[in-house]
């Protein structure tokens, strides 16, 4: 990033965080809500501060035998074809590209892929297409490919994702460090322009990678290598394949949360990192109902895998601390909101109500300050995501925790997003 843009981001963050500190002290002081505000501000400063120090890996990647694995279920035909074309266009050679259809009821996509592979023989010599007779879930679809490949490195790609031509090459630069066992790229919404929800989702994605994963990467322990674009060393996948396919939680089989699970396997071996120069765009839900179902699935996966991460507190305290921070911030927010609503000692007049709303807006702007130089106009929508996060996504997260044993996590009937 040019020094001018980076300086602008840092100065803007300092300005916004200063206002946030003042408003929090004025509005809530040393109350429960005020204490939460202090902890939140501290956490923001730590995460944003680390993200400002982040630098991507450089150098020429070593020679690896790489296999791409693309599971698909009832995917849009053109979307899957675009995914395949983007993988074929990689600047780093792939030894194998597996497309595994997981028993789709709508076979248009896999038929289109088969026709394309048969027609474009010269460029598709290393493409292997497989149709499963029954729907077993994403993990089993991936495992079909893992079991048949002797690759040194596996590239995982979601079926609704476009990966940039140099994405794999950039990811593999991180593997020049032999202590790195998994890496993920930067994700944005391909359909960002569709409506307000997709714009807000893109803002959230940019923060999740450009801030959260950048900060975690600096410590060598990102918590999730995202499904749309990640690489894993063979040692991460193959020894854990049976565990991966047959994972259970509270006595029930686990079918999703694959990326978090694989990341935990990688953490057991070494470092997991983020490579900002490896980029991809993915389709995101544009209807609120589908979006909330997706978030519900992700929330349940977050809580399940967080339990596993916290257990690593002796072997890998940094991973446990990142996880504990996320869980504690969620729990404290619930307590703070309850205190705000039901504690009669806190009297909200119009001025304080305006200040409270201002805090929500400024927190959102602080979280997404990186987005300011990328899409300045859309950056101003960040407060809307703050409202969505506080009044919709946080209650949904609590609901997900309370219903974590319910395996009916919801999918889209026509097109399932595997995330």
Swiss-Prot record:
Transmembrane segments: 8-28, 33-53, 318-338, 345-365, 376-396
Lipid biosynthesis in keyword set: no
E.C. number: 2.4.1.212
Membrane-topology descriptor: Multi-pass membrane protein
Subcellular location: Cell membrane
Cofactor requirements of the protein: Mg(2+)
Record's keyword annotation contains Magnesium: no
A biological-process GO annotation: hyaluronan biosynthetic process
Primary enzyme class: transferase
Functional pathway: Glycan biosynthesis; hyaluronan biosynthesis
Domain of life according to the entry: Bacteria
GO cellular component, one term: plasma membrane
Keywords: Capsule biogenesis/degradation, Cell membrane, Glycosyltransferase, Membrane, Transferase, Transmembrane, Transmembrane helix, Virulence
GO molecular function: hyaluronan synthase activity
Primary residence: membrane
Family: Belongs to the NodC/HAS family.
Described purpose of this protein according to its UniProt entry: Glycosaminoglycan synthesis. The hyaluronic acid capsule is involved in the pathogenicity of group A Streptococci; it may be the major virulence determinant.
Name by which UniProt lists this protein: Hyaluronan synthase
Lineage: Bacteria, Bacillati, Bacillota, Bacilli, Lactobacillales
């Amino acid at each position: 990033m040019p020094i001018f843009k980076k300086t602008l981001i840092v100065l803007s963050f300092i300005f916004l965080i200063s206002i946030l500190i003042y408003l929090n002290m004025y509005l809530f002081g040393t109350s429960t809500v005020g204490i939460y505000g202090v902890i939140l501000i501290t956490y923001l400063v730590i995460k944003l501060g680390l993200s400002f120090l982040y630098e991507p890996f450089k150098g020429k990647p070593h020679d690896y035998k790489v296999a791409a694995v693309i599971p698909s279920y009832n995917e849009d035909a053109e979307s899957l074809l675009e995914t395949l074309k983007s993988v074929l266009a990689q600047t780093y050679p792939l030894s194998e590209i597996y497309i595994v259809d997981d028993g789709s009821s709508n076979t248009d996509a896999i038929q289109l892929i088969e026709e394309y592979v048969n027609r474009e023989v010269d460029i598709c010599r290393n493409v292997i297409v497989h149709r499963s007779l029954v729907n077993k879930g994403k993990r089993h679809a991936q495992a079909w490919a893992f079991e048949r490949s002797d690759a040194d490195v596996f590239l995982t790609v979601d079926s609704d994702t476009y990966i940039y031509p140099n994405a794999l090459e950039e990811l593999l630069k991180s593997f020049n460090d032999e202590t790195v066992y998994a890496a993920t790229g930067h994700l944005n919404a391909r359909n960002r322009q569709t409506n307000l929800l997709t714009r807000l989702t893109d803002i959230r994605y940019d923060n999740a990678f450009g801030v959260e994963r950048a900060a975690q990467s600096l410590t060598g322990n990102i918590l999730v290598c995202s499904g749309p674009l990640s690489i894993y060393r063979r040692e991460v996948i193959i020894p854990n394949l049976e565990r991966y396919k047959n994972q259970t939680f509270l006595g029930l089989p686990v079918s999703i949360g694959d990326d978090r699970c694989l990341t935990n396997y990688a953490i057991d071996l070494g470092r997991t990192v983020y490579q900002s120069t490896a980029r991809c765009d993915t389709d995101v839900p544009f209807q609120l109902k589908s979006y909330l179902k997706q978030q519900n699935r992700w929330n349940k996966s977050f809580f399940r895998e967080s339990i596993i991460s916290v257990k690593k507190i002796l072997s890998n305290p940094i991973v446990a601390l990142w996880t504990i921070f996320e869980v504690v911030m969620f729990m404290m927010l619930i307590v703070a909101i309850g205190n705000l609503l039901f504690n009669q000692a806190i009297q909200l007049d119009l001025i304080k109500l305006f200040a409270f709303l201002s805090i929500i807006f400024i927190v959102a702007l602080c979280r997404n300050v990186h987005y300011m130089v990328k899409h300045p106009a859309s950056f101003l929508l960040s407060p809307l995501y703050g409202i969505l996060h506080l009044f919709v996504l946080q209650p949904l997260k609590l609901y997900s925790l309370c219903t974590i044993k319910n395996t009916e996590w919801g999918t889209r009937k026509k097109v399932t997003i595997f995330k």
